[in-house]
């Protein structure tokens, strides 16, 4: 994400398609913290919102990540039956991890191609509302602790 300078592309993609976004520790600042689709970090040190959504998602789009144990909670976050993982990565080795669908491309170019392919698709309204509620709960937890 960061090397591709795809931060704006990610935000636009997430907004258009109603997709919540979590970031890895290495991907910090890929999404503005105040963006309504931003759910915080994922993994061992992740937010309650990001980790819960990852556990419930039917499709996970992983962009530029190695999906290592620190990010996946030793795969605990990605065990739901039938879940599909789409790995968008410039490195084939990382793109094929966890039995996902490998999309080998630059993040910015890959997001543009996915956006074109998805057309006007948006995540179901109930999923978007659930993500927004989880974000609100997480933000309140964070505010109370700081």
Locate each region found by the language model:
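Aromatic-residue hotspot detector
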Residues: 31, 78-79, 114
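Phosphate/pyrophosphate-binding active-site segments
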Residues: 82, 86-146
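Short amphipathic alpha-helical segments
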Residues: 7-9, 72-76, 98-100, 115
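Anionic-ligand anchoring segments at beta-strand to alpha-helix junctions in alpha/beta enzyme folds, i.e.
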Residues: 1-60
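Short charge-dense sequence patches
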Residues: 5-8, 58-68, 108-116
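Phosphate/diphosphate-binding loops
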Residues: 43-94
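Short, hinge-like loop/turn segments at secondary-structure boundaries
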Residues: 37-42, 80, 103-105
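Short gly/pro/ser/thr-enriched loop/turn and capping motifs at secondary-structure boundaries
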Residues: 27-32, 68-69, 92-96, 111
């Amino acid at each position: 994400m960061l090397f591709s300078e795809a931060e704006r592309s990610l935000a636009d993609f997430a907004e258009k398609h109603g997709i919540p976004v979590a970031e890895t520790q290495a991907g910090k600042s890929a999404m503005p913290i105040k963006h309504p689709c931003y759910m915080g970090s994922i993994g061992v040190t992740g937010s309650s919102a990001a980790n819960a959504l990852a556990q419930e998602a039917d499709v996970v789009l992983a962009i530029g990540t190695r999906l290592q144990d620190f990010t996946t909670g030793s795969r605990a976050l990605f065990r739901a039956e039938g879940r599909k993982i789409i790995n968008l990565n410039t490195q084939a080795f990382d793109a094929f991890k966890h039995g996902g669908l490998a999309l080998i491309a630059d993040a910015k170019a890959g997001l543009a191609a996915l956006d074109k392919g998805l057309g006007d698709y948006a995540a179901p309204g109930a999923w978007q509302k659930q993500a927004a509620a989880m974000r609100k709960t997480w933000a309140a937890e964070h505010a109370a602790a700081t």
